[in-house]
Amino acid sequence: MEKLTEKDKELIRGSWESLGKNKVPHGVVMFSRLFELEPALLNLFHYNTNCSPTQDCLSSPEFLDHVTKVMLVIDAAVSHLDDLHTLEDFLLNLGKKHQAVGVNTQSFAVVGESLLYMLQCSLGHGYTGPLRQAWLNMYTIVVAAMSRGWAKNGEHKTD
């Protein structure tokens, strides 16, 4: 697993300090952007509510629970910047779960774009080129582990 620079860690921690206190609204911004960029992903969420307008889905309790879980994964990554390798098994399993529900690895890139969009919207002028790159570096490490889990899960499927 790759490592982040000390500057990357400092930038990520500093920006997450305020965002991490209010996870769900920031997560909703991220998922709103995700569904703008890749509307077909909305079909992967089979909740009891009709997700016809995207906003109905984004405000459903089940979906907000998913948003919370995603934001907690980001929080865990930020909390373990010095030892991201300790999250390896968790991230492998997360990749397997995403493969099992029909998420393809190309969608991970769109989630990354959506994360960066949320950071830009939330941080305003605090969103700088180096900050963007630091988050991208961390996200790349997280997604690499998830992709390995996704691939391993695919190997065990029989057609």
From Swiss-Prot:
Residues 3-151 form the Globin domain. InterPro entries: Globin, Globin-like_OT, Globin-like_sf, Globin/Proto. It is found in: Cytoplasm, Cytosol; Mitochondrion matrix. Its main location: cytoplasm. It comes from the Eukaryota. The keyword Oxidoreductase applies. Heme b binds at H66, H98. PROSITE patterns: GLOBIN. It catalyses: Fe(III)-heme b-[protein] + nitric oxide + H2O = Fe(II)-heme b-[protein] + nitrite + 2 H(+). Monomer. Homodimers and homotetramers. Mainly monomeric but also detected as part of homodimers and homotetramers. Monomeric globin with a bis-histidyl six-coordinate heme-iron atom through which it can bind dioxygen, carbon monoxide and nitric oxide. Could help transport oxygen and increase its availability to the metabolically active neuronal tissues, though its low quantity in tissues as well as its high affinity for dioxygen, which may limit its oxygen-releasing ability, argue against it. The ferrous/deoxygenated form exhibits a nitrite reductase activity and it could produce nitric oxide which in turn inhibits cellular respiration in response to hypoxia. This is Neuroglobin-2. The gene is ngb2.
